[in-house]
Regions:
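Short conserved loop adjoining the S-adenosyl-L-methionine
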Residues: 34-35, 41-48, 62-64
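Mobile active-site "lid"/loop adjacent to the S-adenosyl-L-methionine
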Residues: 52, 56-87
């Protein structure tokens, strides 16, 4: 199985941070990805047949000088939407016709529903954690598995 991690960072979500069949992408060279690139413009040929896409995008519009910003970078709300939408489109371009995407989101500043709508032309929810109305109002992290649209 070929895996493409489009927001590798420090690989905190990985149990094996150097999984052999994974291409780790990040735009920051200091985190030592396999490829230094913007996930919205990958230097990968179309249809390179990735089976699984891992996408844990930036989700919080934090101050430029905070601890979290120094670790994950500073992004405005519109930049975050651009990253999510552009990466979803690019992931579709380089993935197999039956690929899946493991997607992580925290509704710190933008609702999960609104973010999924940005991805809808290319990816559709298959299953994931359902949330209550109360948890939608709180800052909660969710994982979902998406299926590539044809």
């Amino acid at each position: 199985m070929k895996i493409l991690d489009l927001s590798a960072g420090n690989r905190a979500i990985w149990f094996d941070r150097f999984y052999r069949d994974t291409l780790y992408v990040d735009r920051r060279a200091e985190v030592n990805p396999t490829i230094v690139a913007d996930s919205r413009a990958l230097p990968i040929e179309t249809g390179d047949a990735y089976d699984l896409i891992v996408f844990d995008p930036p989700h919080a519009n934090l101050g430029a000088n905070g601890k979290m910003s120094s670790r994950y970078g500073h992004h405005t709300a519109s930049e975050i939407r651009s990253i999510v939408e552009g990466t979803a489109k690019e992931a579709h371009r380089v993935s197999r016709h039956d690929a899946l995407m493991s997607f992580k989101w925290n509704n710190h500043d933008q609702s999960f529903k609104n973010i999924l709508e940005l991805m809808a032309p290319w990816w559709e929810p298959l299953f994931g954690q359902k949330t209550s109305e109360r948890s939608r109002r709180l800052r909660s992290t969710q994982w979902i598995l998406l299926r590539r649209r044809s």
